[in-house]
Design a protein with these regions (language model features):
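N-terminal glutamine amidotransferase
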Residues: 1-100
Length: 101
């Protein structure tokens, strides 16, 4: 199981709104988490073997207007932790993605 959330705003995302969304996502899994967000003109990606609440305490999202988050029960190990970023594309999904040639 996993929880997914995202915020896109013209204003900086409030920590209160982010905490509410993270709390709801955490109901679906607490073993690993990930965040992808913008601080001004720079994007940051974090993945961790802890709850989304713990991860949020370790990163600075104070100037973010765009945040995607993922919280899950580990089913395939930490190597499958999300978000996944490759070739300028960031993906968070609910399911299993199998690589294709």
């Amino acid at each position: 199981m996993c929880g997914i959330f995202g915020i896109v705003s013209n204003e900086v995302v409030s920590s209160k709104n982010l905490d509410i969304l993270a709390h709801h996502a955490e109901q679906r899994g607490r073993d690993s988490s990930g965040l992808y967000f913008s601080n001004e003109d720079r994007f940051s990606l974090y993945r961790a073997p802890c709850s989304i609440s713990k991860l949020l305490r370790k990163v600075n999202t104070d100037s973010s207007k765009f945040i995607m988050g993922h919280s899950r029960l580990i089913t395939n190990g930490l190597s499958d932790n999300q978000p996944v970023y490759q070739n300028s594309v960031c993906v968070i999904h609910n399911g299993i993605v199998v690589n294709h040639d």
